[in-house]
From Swiss-Prot:
Function field: The RuvA-RuvB-RuvC complex processes Holliday junction (HJ) DNA during genetic recombination and DNA repair, while the RuvA-RuvB complex plays an important role in the rescue of blocked DNA replication forks via replication fork reversal (RFR). RuvA specifically binds to HJ cruciform DNA, conferring on it an open structure. The RuvB hexamer acts as an ATP-dependent pump, pulling dsDNA into and through the RuvAB complex. HJ branch migration allows RuvC to scan DNA until it finds its consensus sequence, where it cleaves and resolves the cruciform DNA.
InterPro entries given in the database record: DNA_helicase_Holl-junc_RuvA_I, NA-bd_OB-fold, RuvA, RuvA_2-like, RuvA_C, RuvA_C_sf
Primary localization: cytoplasm
Chain intervals for the UniProt region annotation (Flexible linker): 143-149
Coiled-coil region(s): none
Domain comment quoted from the record: Has three domains with a flexible linker between the domains II and III and assumes an 'L' shape. Domain III is highly mobile and contacts RuvB.
GO annotation terms (biological process): DNA recombination; DNA repair
GO annotations of cellular component type: cytoplasm; Holliday junction helicase complex; Holliday junction resolvase complex
The protein, known as: Holliday junction branch migration complex subunit RuvA
Top-level taxonomy: Bacteria, Pseudomonadati, Pseudomonadota, Alphaproteobacteria, Rickettsiales
């Protein structure tokens, strides 16, 4: 399973980008917002969600961990698949989505082409208990977010990321718990880096 790709943008399509990693081109589907940020020939790091099916393997890329989290959250709503989740993220940021859900603002979602009244209502109802409460207008999961503010979904994403990087789920859970106990203020990025560093030290 691929959890992250670091490489140069080779080319782009309407809904995907080709990332060149040491001469190997990976086709990665992404939201319109992400694709609009990428520039051909420039180097980027993308968080990857890998979907394995009998007939194909699809990679979905995100510039931030929070976008990946909301990609998966949206798919937990009945009637939303990968394509619709990316389409919604092309129109709304994770912060926009969280604020709309907390405010029960269905019109934000209804304004998106392809999202009808019933689906907009389901998004609000089914995500209401899954997103962290925030003050109106405030950002959600910042790059320097403290672990004490991470939602259970975000914590699971950290564990999932470590599993994608070679940990067993048991190892990942123990690593996260141990690091947080020692440093409750650690950020998501530092948590992952520390877990990898500790694991490498144990193997050396």
């Amino acid at each position: 399973m691929i959890g992250k790709l670091s490489g140069k943008v080779d080319s782009q399509g309407d809904d995907y980008v080709i990332i060149d990693v040491n001469g190997v081109g990976y086709l990665v589907y992404a939201s319109g917002k992400t694709l609009g940020t990428l520039a051909e020939g420039e180097f980027y790091k993308l968080f990857i969600e890998t979907h394995v099916r009998e007939e194909h393997i699809h990679l979905y890329g995100f510039l931030t961990l929070e976008e990946k989290i909301f990609f998966n959250l949206l798919q937990s709503v009945n009637g939303i698949g990968t394509r619709m989740a990316l389409f919604i993220l092309s129109s709304l940021t994770p912060s926009d989505i969280q604020i709309a859900v907390n405010n029960e603002d269905k019109n934000i979602f209804k304004a998106i082409s392809g999202v009808g009244a019933k689906l907009a209502e389901r998004i609000v109802l089914e995500l209401k208990g899954k997103v962290a409460k925030i003050s109106s207008g405030s950002a959600i999961i910042k790059e320097s977010l403290n672990i004490k503010n991470i939602t259970p979904v975000a914590s699971n994403e950290v564990i999932k990321a470590l599993v994608n990087l070679g940990f067993s789920r048991f190892e990942a859970q123990n690593a996260v718990q141990g690091i947080i106990t020692q440093n409750p203020e650690i950020s998501i990025d530092e948590l992952i880096k520390t877990a990898l560093k500790n694991r490498n030290s144990n193997f050396s």
